[in-house]
Amino acid sequence: MVMRQEETDNSSSTNFFVGRYSENFGQQNRIGGLMTIKNTPLGSNIGSTIDGFIRINEAQSINTILTHTVTTNTNKQGFAGFAQYYNSTNHYKIWLTQSVVTKNFDPQMGFISRTDVIGTTPGMNWYYRGNKLPFKKILRAFEPGILPEFYWQASTGKFIESSLYFFPVWLNFQSGAFFGYAITPVYQHLTEAFEPLGVTIAPGTYNYLQNWILAGTDPSKFISASVDYKWGTYFNGKLESADWRLQFAPIPHISLLAEFNRNHFMDVGEPKQSSTVDLFILQGRFALNPRIQLIGFYQKNSFDNSQSYNIRFAWEYQPLSYIYFIYNHGSFDKSPQPKQTEEHIIAKISYLKQF
């Protein structure tokens, strides 16, 4: 794919390129490559990726992605990658993921949550549907699990973070509903200030404990609902966060979703402060058939008084070939800055020929 973005008052003209190759080998294995180029008058950012998937047997598999980036105007190079082992059966799932992102890794046509980090994230879920499960007319399965996460700073090797997600309770119901509870001890060593939603957390070492409840009804029903609620200590204070979702899907062609998210900080940061940030989301999906869809999305954020909406028309005119028309609108009004608005119109056509 090749795309050019014209020069504006705030940015120079930019050329984009994405190339992808993938090939199956053996009966259940795959190897592929991806190249991205972002070119501006100041220089180019080039990303080179190889990826692979190996099916060892019915239960076990390994997949990996390795990426190298170079930015020509700074001559900085970086690397990121992960390797993941899965062992999944009807009775359990075990996995181990090892990942690394170096300090100078810079994928300007992609997204990463952080740089300069090494992550080790194993996990295990146990699936029990046996005779000792009570209330079998109501309960389908008991699926406890543990999902620890460990992180080191890649440039120094210092241990900086751990989160020990432990789900002693996870219940799947015969109705399609679910309920889960987790308790999570967290250790974090911040090397620089951290600002979640306008709250400043000073560098230092923190230990805190959070509780987590997840519940939901059968999402295939006419009306479905779910809740994601967390509470507990948070760095040097407390945090309550919740996400409520309500979906209305009267027929397969129509789906409407309303979502409300709230984060309530209590005595958090330096200096200690309390605040509440709300996020409202509305989403609609309308399908004439599986190949022609109109999708709308609206979001309002109380943190910066921002509002944004997106309307997308998608037509799959032949298998894996699409025509898109997209309209984006965004605005935010946060004092003392004046209100700012952005609008984008995008038209895209893709064609895939299989040989």
How should these model regions be labeled?
Residues M1-G43, D51:
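A conserved hydrophobic secondary-structure block that centers on an alpha-helix together
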Residues G43-G47, F260:
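Contiguous transmembrane helix-bundle modules in multi-pass membrane proteins
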Residues F53, N57, I62-F355:
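Exposed, low-structure sequence patches enriched in small/polar residues
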